[in-house]
Regions:
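A generic secondary-structure boundary signal that marks alpha-helix termini
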Residues: 20, 61, 148-152
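Bacterial N-terminal signal peptides that target proteins for export
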Residues: 2-14
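Glycine-rich catalytic cores of cysteine/serine-nucleophile enzymes that process amide/ester linkages
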Residues: 30-103
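A structural motif
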Residues: 107-120
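Second-shell loop/turn segments in exported
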Residues: 39-43, 101-110, 125-133
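C-terminal segment of classical bacterial N-terminal signal peptides
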Residues: 17-27
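Activation targets extended, charge/polar-rich intrinsically disordered C-terminal tails
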Residues: 32, 119-187
Length: 187
């Protein structure tokens, strides 16, 4: 028994709509968020003020989940830090500490930029010799380089080189397009 004309037209329209959805439906573009954090320091826990970056998201090309963080510091904290370059390391924060830090702002980057930023992390990790310098290559300079790769304006005023929160607040003010607000408190 032939299908009534109305049902044939309806079935054809439904098939066309479904086909167009299949053709135009694309997977959501995966991105990695890069958050810029500062830690105020804690006399109780023996921690100095610090700044670091957190990468979270999914790579578009592979679907790989990303959840990692990196900061730059001296391998050992001794008075030698005050007199010039010392041995360095990339510091990875424990997850329990990240929630207790200040998240200043977040950038969203594509796979290519994520790879550039990670290459920069590895360049600092594998720099030869004594690479950490309290006044010239500390955690602020490391995070600043990551921010610059992300297209942000960065500077390093001498009076902020040992004040990560204040320095990230300055980066926030230099980049109003972020829509971020300064984080208050001492440091």
């Amino acid at each position: 028994m032939p299908m009534p004309r109305f049902f044939r037209s309806f079935a054809l329209c439904l098939a066309l709509v479904c086909a167009s959805l299949l053709v135009t439906a694309q997977p959501a573009e995966a991105k990695v968020k890069v958050s810029f954090h500062s830690f105020n320091g804690s006399v109780v826990f023996g921690r100095y003020p610090h700044t670091f970056v957190v990468f979270e998201g999914t790579l578009d090309e592979t679907g790989q989940a990303i959840n990692e963080n990196f900061g730059f510091t001296a391998k050992t904290v001794t008075p030698a830090i005050l007199s010039g370059p010392v041995a360095h390391m990339i510091w990875v924060e424990e997850p329990k500490w990240i929630g207790k830090t200040n998240r200043h702002f977040t950038l969203t980057v594509d796979d290519a930029m994520y790879r550039k930023m990670r290459a920069e992390v590895e360049a600092w990790r594998n720099a030869p010799g004594k690479y950490y310098d309290l006044d010239n290559r500390n955690c602020i300079h490391f995070v600043g380089k990551i921010a610059q790769l992300g297209g942000l304006k960065v500077d390093y005023p001498k009076d902020l080189l040992r004040k990560p929160r204040s320095w990230l607040n300055r980066v926030t003010s230099l980049n109003p397009q972020l829509g971020a607000k300064a984080i208050g408190g001492k440091n």
